[in-house]
Amino acid sequence: MHYYVTDNRAACVPLNEIPTAGYAEFYEDLAERLADERYHIGHYFALPDGDVLRAYCLLLDDTEHRVLVASYAIGYYDTPLLPSLTARHPQVHPFEREITERYGVRFADMPWNKPLRFPFDRYNRSSSIDNYPFYTIEGASLHEVNVGPIHAGIIEPGAFRFICNGEQVLHLEIALGYQHRGVERTMTADDNVLR
């Protein structure tokens, strides 16, 4: 697969110079590179582009100190389930979750396909922080402790769900998103004075 390659991590990249691959090629190449510890994802996101949704991935090469940028395009309504990179590389989960949440793209075998931030312009408006699907475990000696939504001062407000067996915490799930500010929309707006 071809990438736009730069060693300047602060550079602007012309969108028309970023190579576009098919999803199958994108998936296989990224899965192979992420198996090598020298690579990790800097960002992976999608944006509407005419009648398609274009996803961009910034892959960081820690050995050669380069940024590799690639993309793929999928149709909004004719897209089948896409293989999930998260199933092979857990570091991808927040990126795939956001793409699902914002645009409704479905990834097969996604082990933790839950909302991430509840942006105002999300694909499924009926999904809200109030009906967040917390992880559950059944058992006579287990109990759940729900804390929040609270603001701890350092992090944004969130709800914390502990699953405990006596005093031992078996699982903690944190739901953030109470304070989503729509940064992506702000940065891509034509009238944005910050750009």
Model-inferred region functions:
Residues 158-195:
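Function-dense linear segments that define catalytic or interfacial modules
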Residues 1-172:
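Terminal low-complexity/charged segments
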